[in-house]
């Protein structure tokens, strides 16, 4: 796996984010008049609390930032589409702008959280819709990468070899 810092791999940080992502739920719990339980702000507060835990465990600044971002934005992949079937290009752009290099990790955290939250009550049609929306975001991200940095068709080394030129 990809080592990030301090000998820790990216997948380790994702697992830590999975473990700690709902750490702020007890302190953010509210009950609406109709009895519905909500956890407003738990993602942002949880990111801060998790970073404190990782600080005490001597994780690097970079690792704390990565886990913090994964936790802060873990609900966003499921919210990007809104009422639509798929998210807008603008929503996808903003998501990756905000999550930086942990955008894909955060999507995996979101999928795991969604499955765990629904548990045995998971409705396959709803899961299919959620998974398709998230898959679309990933496809758009990889398409963008191939457009932003397309493979070189020919290099200076190729030209030197083809025309028998010397460098310089």
Regions found by a protein language model. Give the residues of each.
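Charged substrate- and nucleic-acid-binding regions of tRNA-handling and nucleotidyl-transfer enzymes
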Residues: 50-56, 117-168
């Amino acid at each position: 796996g990809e080592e990030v810092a301090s000998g820790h791999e990216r997948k380790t940080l994702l697992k830590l984010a999975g473990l700690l992502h709902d750490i702020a739920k007890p302190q953010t719990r509210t009950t609406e008049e109709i009895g519905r339980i909500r956890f407003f702000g738990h993602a942002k507060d949880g990111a801060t609390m998790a970073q404190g835990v990782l600080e005490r465990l001597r994780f690097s600044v970079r690792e704390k930032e990565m886990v913090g971002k994964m936790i802060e934005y873990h609900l966003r992949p499921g919210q990007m589409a809104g009422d639509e079937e798929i998210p807008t290009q603008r929503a996808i752009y903003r998501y990756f702008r905000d999550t930086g290099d942990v955008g894909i990790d955060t999507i995996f955290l979101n999928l795991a959280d969604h499955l765990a939250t629904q548990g045995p009550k998971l409705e396959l049609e709803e899961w299919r819709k959620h998974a398709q929306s998230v898959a679309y975001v990933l496809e758009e991200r990889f398409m963008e990468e191939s457009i932003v940095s397309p493979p070189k068709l020919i290099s200076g080394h190729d030209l030197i070899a083809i025309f028998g030129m010397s460098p310089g």
